[in-house]
Structure formats: structure tokens, C-alpha cells
Curated annotation (Swiss-Prot):
Protein name per UniProt: Rho GTPase-activating protein 15
Cellular component aspect of the GO annotation: cytoplasm; nucleoplasm; plasma membrane
Biological role stated in the UniProt entry: GTPase activator for the Rho-type GTPases by converting them to an inactive GDP-bound state. Has activity toward RAC1. Overexpression results in an increase in actin stress fibers and cell contraction.
Recorded superkingdom: Eukaryota
Written domain comment of the UniProt record: The PH domain is required for localization to the membrane.
SUPFAM superfamilies found in the cross-reference section: GTPase activation domain, GAP, PH domain-like
Primary localization class, coarse: cytoplasm
Pfam families assigned: PH, RhoGAP
Localization: Cytoplasm; Membrane
Domain named PH: residues: 87-197
GO biological process: regulation of cell shape; signal transduction
Length: 481
């Protein structure tokens, strides 16, 4: 019995030893298999490492990670080494208005923007916080301006605001930037001008294709870059990336683009042809009086007649007529409608403030490319007003008026006749001949080149307008109404 028990114990012990040996062998086998598997994985990684992309001589990109789940997660920086991000040269808040998009005029809409100047571009953000956001969807809405080939200039005539300059890009986009702080806007103007001057004047400067790829808001490769990395040979990848990197500077491509541009420019119709067909029309405001009258087949602009008629209908007895300013935004709206040659009814409720109508009329005369009193007549009218004898002064004035071009003569006559009706009701509107002379003198006549005698000229301008108004009947007495 004891011997059987001993055998059983020995057998059990042997079994346990056998199990331990088997387990050890199994573990050893598993470890070997794991090492083999790891070795295979390492070899697989080595095979992937061999298919690297050569961009520049002696430089090798990082191997493509195997931990990405699909090709869409392989971002551009895994294939193309990122270009150096240009250093931020200047940033801050300015007032911005986009007035043209691709050559198409836009309504001016001012807004405060956080502006960043870096390298060859300007970026407009809603505020400084948006610039710091890494979210691609947020940054996708950022407006960027390529300064290569752009033009910058001061634009006083584009806005009633002070210190405004304009940036025009080669793509036809136009932006106005403004600040009430003089030294700040001057600093911005000089910084942007310096950035433009550093860039080539050729719009195709630099490697545009690669530059656009880097600026793209998408984190994925372009569609033509979605290729099977296992099947593509290394030399094919190298060749593809070489073409991508150097395509913008390829001589044959440049010659082909130049040839197409030359053909396009040579076939483009002239400005005169477009104007004759009515596709391009000069604006009413800011044009030459002769041009406006010639287009309307008249010697007095239609807009001038409309304004005078409206004022005489409902504004002769309004206090401060022509002296009080109307709402500038409404005046600009009226100006826009006139320039677009849309239907205009000054009896409409939106023009019920008569000061808006008078303000628009004064703006029309003020913005003429040549004043109502032509530049060539300015000195002659000044010499006439200096004469001491009143009769001699009237005769000289009458002689000068007769020699004016028909559009200037007829428009001047209808305007001063209208102003005499304003003076006739001076007891109600409180506008004397002297007041109207001060208002219309600098508007209707000025020297072509102001040489420092601005104050002296202003005195003569007021006196000439006042004298023409006072002696209207005698100056135009020999003419039929």
C-alpha cells in the first residue's frame, strides 16, 4: 500500500515536471515566434523606409508612419517637407473695406480687422484670437492677399475718411485700409510697400504651385497624390515630387503661359471699342463736364437739372440750404445710384432730406475732373475781379463767360440763375449772396496748380462767385433764357 502510494506521488511529480517542461518549451516557442514576427515587422518597416522621397540633394524626408489607419491620414507634411513659415513682420487692428473682387466693383463696407503682414502676403482676421486658433475650419475663412505684383497707393478720393490707402492685387482685388492714428497708418503703408518692393514684379514669382499647396486649408494630399505607397516605386515618387517642386520654374511651362497671355492681350478689344458698345461707361461723378454732356447729348448734365428742380420745388425756404450738410452715407448712396445710371426719383422718401440733394449737387461740382470754371480761365477771372471799376469788371466778366465752352457756359448759367432764387428768399432760408459765395467759390473754380497761395486764391474764389451771383442779370443780360 505504501509502495503504491509512493509510486503515485512519484508519477504525479513526474507529470508536473513534464507539464513544466512543456510549458517552458511552449513559451520558448512563442518567444521565438514573437521575435520572428517582430523581425518581420522590422523588416517590413525597413522595406518602407527604403521608399523615401528625395526632395533636395542630401536631404531625406521622414519615413511614412505605419500607425496611420488609412491614406487620408497621411498629411502633406509627411510627403513634402514644410516650407519655412514666413516671419510675422507686422500685425494690428485697422479698418478694412474690400471694394473690388476679381475686377468686379463691390459696395464699400468698413469693418475692423486684425491684419497680419508676413512675407509675401497679408491675412485679414476678425480679431487677434482667430489668428491663434489651430482649427482649420476657422482659418479657412481667413482672407489672404498675395502681395506679389500688387500695387499700393494713397486713396483720398475713394473715401471721406482720412488716411486711407488702397492695395490692388494682380487678380483684380482691391482693399482699402484706414486708421485715424496718423503715425500708425503711415507705418503700415511703409511696411506693406517695402514688402511689395522686395517681391518680383512678375505675378508668377516663386513656386506658386508649391506655395498654394502649403496654403491649402485641407490637411490631405491633393487628389493626384493619392497613390498606393506599396506599389509605387521609389524612383517614381522621386520623379513625381521633383516635378511638383520645380513645375512653376519650368522653362517650357513659362513660355507656354507667356504665349497664351500675349494672344489673349492681342485679341482683347480696346477700351474705345468697349465704350462704343456700351460695355464700359464713364461714371457721372468724377468725370469731365464735357464727357458727361456729350454722352447725354446735352449741354447741361441731367443730374444737375434734377437736383435744381427738386430744390426749387421743396427747398427754397429751408433754413441753411446749401450751407447745412446732409447725411454723408445717404449722399454716397445717391452718388452710387447716379453712377450706375439707375432710375432716379428725387421725390422718393429716401431723399426727403433736401440737404442730401444739395450735398450731392455740391459733390458733383467738387469732383469734376476740371472745375466748372476751366483751369485756363482761372487767372483771367481773378484779374477781372481785381478791377476797381464796377462797369469794367462786369464787361470783362461777361466777355469771359461768352467764351466758355457750351457745357460750362450753359451749366453755369442755369446754376447761378437757381442761386438767385435762393437769395430772393434769404429772409426765410438765411442764405445771403456772401454765404453762397463762400459755399460755391472753392467748389466751382480753383487753380490747376496750388502753389502756396491757397488763402489768397480762396478770397478771390469767394468774390468771383459772389459777384457772378450779384450781377447775374447784367452778365447774362444779352442772352435769352
Amino acid at each position: 500500500m505504501e509502495k503504491r502510494t509512493s509510486c503515485s506521488v512519484q508519477t504525479s511529480t513526474n507529470c508536473d515536471n513534464s507539464l513544466e517542461i512543456l510549458n517552458s518549451a511552449h513559451q520558448a516557442t512563442g518567444a521565438v515566434q514573437m521575435r520572428i514576427k517582430n523581425a518581420n515587422s522590422h523588416q517590413d518597416r525597413q522595406s518602407q523606409t527604403k521608399s523615401m522621397i528625395l526632395t533636395d540633394a542630401g536631404k531625406v524626408t521622414e519615413p511614412i508612419s505605419r500607425h496611420r489607419r488609412n491614406h487620408s491620414q497621411h498629411v502633406l507634411k509627411d510627403v513634402i517637407p514644410p516650407l519655412e513659415h514666413p516671419m510675422v513682420e507686422k500685425e494690428g487692428y485697422l479698418q478694412k473695406a474690400k471694394i473690388a473682387d476679381g475686377g468686379k466693383k463691390l459696395r464699400k463696407n468698413w469693418s475692423t480687422s486684425w491684419i497680419v503682414l508676413s512675407g509675401r502676403k497679408i491675412e485679414f482676421y476678425k480679431d487677434s484670437k482667430q489668428q491663434a486658433l489651430p482649427n482649420m475650419k476657422t482659418r479657412h475663412n481667413v482672407e489672404s492677399v498675395d502681395l506679389c505684383g500688387a500695387h499700393i497707393e494713397w486713396a483720398k478720393e475713394k473715401s471721406s475718411r482720412k488716411s486711407v490707402f488702397q492695395i490692388t492685387t494682380v487678380s483684380g482685388n482691391e482693399f482699402l485700409l484706414q486708421s485715424d492714428i496718423d503715425f500708425l497708418i503711415l507705418d503700415w503703408f511703409q511696411a506693406i510697400k517695402n514688402a511689395i518692393d522686395r517681391l518680383p514684379k512678375n505675378p508668377s514669382c516663386g513656386s506658386l504651385e508649391l506655395f498654394n499647396l502649403q496654403r491649402s486649408s485641407s490637411s490631405e494630399l491633393p487628389s493626384h497624390c493619392h497613390i498606393d505607397r506599396k506599389e509605387q516605386k521609389p524612383e517614381h515618387r522621386k520623379s513625381f515630387m521633383f516635378r511638383l517642386h520645380h513645375s512653376a520654374s519650368d522653362t517650357s511651362d513659362k513660355n507656354r503661359v507667356k504665349s497664351r497671355l500675349k494672344k489673349f492681350i492681342s485679341r482683347r478689344p480696346s477700351l474705345k471699342t468697349l465704350q462704343e458698345k456700351g460695355l464700359i461707361k464713364d461714371q457721372i461723378f468724377g468725370s469731365h463736364l464735357h464727357t458727361v454732356c456729350e454722352r447725354e447729348h446735352s449741354t447741361v448734365p441731367w443730374f444737375v437739372k434734377q437736383c435744381i428742380e427738386a430744390v426749387e420745388k421743396r427747398g427754397l425756404d429751408v433754413d441753411g440750404i446749401y450751407r447745412v450738410s446732409g447725411n454723408l452715407a445717404t449722399i454716397q448712396k445717391l452718388r452710387f445710384i447716379v453712377n450706375q445710371e439707375e432710375k432716379l426719383n428725387l421725390d422718393d422718401s429716401q431723399w426727403e432730406d433736401i440737404h442730401v440733394v444739395t450735398g450731392a449737387l455740391k459733390m458733383f461740382f467738387r469732383e469734376l475732373s476740371e472745375p466748372l470754371f476751366p483751369y485756363s480761365f482761372f487767372e483771367r477771372f481773378v484779374e477781372a475781379i481785381k478791377k476797381q471799376d464796377s462797369n469794367e469788371k462786369i464787361e470783362t466778366m461777361r466777355s469771359l463767360v461768352k467764351r466758355l465752352p457750351p457745357p460750362n457756359h450753359d451749366t453755369m448759367k442755369i446754376l447761378f440763375r437757381h442761386l438767385t432764387k435762393i437769395v430772393a428768399k434769404a429772409s426765410q432760408n438765411l442764405m445771403s449772396t456772401q454765404s453762397l459765395g463762400i459755399v460755391f467759390g472753392p467748389t466751382l473754380l480753383r487753380a490747376e496748380n496750388e502753389s502756396g497761395n491757397v488763402a489768397v486764391h480762396m478770397v478771390y474764389q469767394n468774390q468771383i462767385a459772389e459777384f457772378m451771383l450779384t450781377e447775374y442779370d447784367k452778365i447774362f443780360s444779352s442772352e435769352e433764357d
